[in-house]
Amino acid sequence: MSTIPITKRGAELLKEELHRLKHVERPSVINAISEARAQGDLSENAEYDAAKEKQGFIEGRIQELEGKLSAAQIIDPASLDVTGRVVFGATVELEDLEDGTKLIYQIVGDDEADIALNKISISSPIARALISKEEGDVVAVQAPGGNREVEILAVRYV
C-alpha cells in the first residue's frame, strides 16, 4: 500500500475519530443489538436491523481509519528546508490577478480537505498547480469558473 500524506493535525483527528468509534460508538451499538435481541423474533425487528446496519458502518469505518493511519506519512512542513516554496502542508496566500481577490489556502491530504476552512486537497487542480512554486511566482490554475492566474504572495509553514 502506498503512503498517504497527512498533516500532524489531520492524523490527530483521524485518531480521535477512531478512538470514539472503538470506545463509544461500538459499545453503544453492541448494547442496542443486545436490547433488540431481547425483544424476541428478529425477523421483523426494525431496531435490530438498524443496529446491525449501524454496526456494519462502524466496523467498516474503523477498518478504513486503521488502514489510513497505518499508511499515513505525517508531514510537518515547518521541519522542511523549503523556505518560500509551496509544499504539502504549507499555507499559501494568493492574489487573483484578474480581480485582485486575496485567497489563503492550506494544502492538506484528501481526508483533511475542507474548503470552508480554506483547506484544499493535495490532489486538487489548484494545489497541483502550486506545488514546488515559490513566493512571487505567477501560476495558471484551473478553477471552476475557468483558468485563472494567481500570484503567490506568501508561503507559511504552520
Where are the model-predicted features located?
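Residue-level signal for pocket-adjacent positions within structured domains
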Residues: M1, E16, R37, S43, ...
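Helix-rich terminal scaffold detector
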Residues: M1-E59, Q63
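Non-DNA-binding regulatory cores of transcription-related proteins
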Residues: I75-V158
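Amphipathic alpha-helical coiled-coil segments
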Residues: E59-Q73
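Generic alpha-helical hydrophobic packing signal
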Residues: E17, K52-Q55, K68, T91, ...
